[in-house]
Amino acid sequence: MSFCSFFGGEVFQNHFEPGVYVCAKCGYELFSSHSKYAHSSPWPAFTETIHADSVAKRPEHNRPGALKVSCGRCGNGLGHEFLNDGPKRGQSRFUIFSSSLKFIPKGQESSPSQGQ
């Protein structure tokens, strides 16, 4: 059973081009393609953020080991972080809605922090 409802449209689930995923609302850098990995859930999965402040986290009620994540700059809802559920022992799995992301191909980044 999935933790989130799936309505389709997850265009970045099987997207593995080199580049950076930024917040669709404000353009702040969130995840690198280097931290993206294939996962059985229908949402794009990442192991880590680009910056320590890329995302804000708050506990998910009645769900130990799960945190709601939002953009660290504008507060746009992104999805969840599942602690110790990544591809390697001790890694997290960030399960992120494609609609909350914009992809910037490698070489087309405009600055170290998009949207400034």
Swiss-Prot record:
GO cellular component assignments: actin cytoskeleton; cytoplasm; nucleus
This protein's UniProt keywords: Cytoplasm, Cytoskeleton, Immunity, Innate immunity, Metal-binding, Nucleus, Oxidoreductase, Selenocysteine, Ubl conjugation, Zinc
InterPro entries per UniProt: Met_Sox_Rdtase_MsrB_dom, MsrB_Met_sulfoxide_reductase, Mss4-like_sf
Cofactor binding annotation: Binds 1 zinc ion per subunit.
Main subcellular location: cytoplasm
Role this protein plays: Methionine-sulfoxide reductase that specifically reduces methionine (R)-sulfoxide back to methionine. While in many cases, methionine oxidation is the result of random oxidation following oxidative stress, methionine oxidation is also a post-translational modification that takes place on specific residue. Acts as a regulator of actin assembly by reducing methionine (R)-sulfoxide mediated by MICALs (MICAL1, MICAL2 or MICAL3) on actin, thereby promoting filament repolymerization. Plays a role in innate immunity by reducing oxidized actin, leading to actin repolymerization in macrophages.
Subcellular location: Cytoplasm; Nucleus; Cytoplasm, Cytoskeleton
GO-annotated biological processes: actin filament polymerization; innate immune response; protein repair
Post-translational modification: Truncated MSRB1/SEPX1 proteins produced by failed UGA/Sec decoding are ubiquitinated by the CRL2(FEM1C) E3 ubiquitin-protein ligase complex.
Entry's EC annotation: 1.8.4.12, 1.8.4.14
Name assigned to this protein: Methionine-R-sulfoxide reductase B1
Domain MsrB stretches: 1-106
Family annotation (PANTHER family): METHIONINE-R-SULFOXIDE REDUCTASE B1
Binding annotation for Zn(2+): C23, C26, C71, C74
GO molecular function: actin binding; L-methionine-(R)-S-oxide reductase activity; peptide-methionine (R)-S-oxide reductase activity; zinc ion binding
Catalytic residues identified in the record: U95 (nucleophile)
Catalytic activity: L-methionyl-[protein] + [thioredoxin]-disulfide + H2O = L-methionyl-(R)-S-oxide-[protein] + [thioredoxin]-dithiol; [thioredoxin]-disulfide + L-methionine + H2O = L-methionine (R)-S-oxide + [thioredoxin]-dithiol
Listed cofactors: Zn(2+)
Origin species: Sus scrofa (Pig)
Recorded family membership: Belongs to the MsrB Met sulfoxide reductase family.
